[in-house]
């Protein structure tokens, strides 16, 4: 019987600190502990209306553009706008007016992914109203913006300077025909 001996240099390291550690599991686990029946994810099997599943219709997007918060409601009158502005002032947020002359809704011109490159940046009307405590001051600025840009969209935002986030945003004025 012929035998051959191959000699190769081998370097081994011994870690004395890990001598009490158990080697990781390297074999296959038994499948006996796992369920073998596949669940059915079809929602028609759990429908309680005799097997007929009806879905709700989404809002039709053609000819009914929606803008921001409260845009599904009728336009706000001056008293309702004042209440919204009082709310954001009570929360300690800083009111600010923004306007847009061309696109008052989300649009994608150069990018197809939803994010901040989809037409959400509007032009700021003056500076944020730091120190504002009265809703009539904001409504006065809104009137000035409406006279300056009668064919533009104007929105009021509330900015939280502690968390540095925009907390509320709603359309305060839409041009005629929208």
UniProtKB/Swiss-Prot annotation:
Assigned GO CC terms: chloroplast
GO molecular function: ribulose-bisphosphate carboxylase activity
Keyword Plastid: yes
SMART domains xrefs: RuBisCO_small
Subcellular location: Plastid, Chloroplast
GO BP terms, alphabetized: photorespiration; reductive pentose-phosphate cycle
Miscellaneous notes: The basic functional RuBisCO is composed of a large chain homodimer in a 'head-to-tail' conformation. In form I RuBisCO this homodimer is arranged in a barrel-like tetramer with the small subunits forming a tetrameric 'cap' on each end of the 'barrel'.
Main function: RuBisCO catalyzes two reactions: the carboxylation of D-ribulose 1,5-bisphosphate, the primary event in carbon dioxide fixation, as well as the oxidative fragmentation of the pentose substrate. Both reactions occur simultaneously and in competition at the same active site. Although the small subunit is not catalytic it is essential for maximal activity.
Self-association and partners: Heterohexadecamer of 8 large and 8 small subunits.
Protein name, UniProt field: Ribulose bisphosphate carboxylase small subunit, chloroplastic 1
Species classification: Eukaryota, Viridiplantae, Streptophyta, Embryophyta, Tracheophyta
């Amino acid at each position: 019987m012929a035998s051959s001996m191959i000699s190769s240099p081998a370097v081994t390291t011994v870690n004395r600190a890990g001598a009490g550690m158990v080697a990781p599991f390297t074999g296959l686990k038994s499948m006996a502990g796992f369920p073998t029946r596949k669940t059915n994810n079809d929602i028609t099997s759990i429908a309680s209306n005799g097997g007929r599943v009806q879905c709700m219709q989404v809002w039709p997007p053609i000819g009914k553009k929606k803008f921001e918060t409260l845009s599904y409601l009728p336009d706000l009158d001056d008293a309702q706008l004042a209440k919204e502005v009082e709310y954001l002032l009570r929360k300690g947020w800083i009111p600010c007016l923004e306007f847009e002359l061309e696109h008052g809704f989300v649009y994608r011109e150069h990018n197809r992914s939803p994010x901040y490159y989809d037409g959400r940046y509007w032009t700021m009307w003056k500076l944020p109203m730091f120190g504002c405590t009265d809703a009539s001051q904001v409504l006065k600025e809104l009137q000035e913006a409406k006279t300056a840009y009668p064919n533009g969209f104007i929105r009021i935002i509330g900015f939280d300077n502690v968390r540095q986030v925009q907390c509320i945003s709603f359309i305060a004025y839409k041009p005629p025909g929208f």
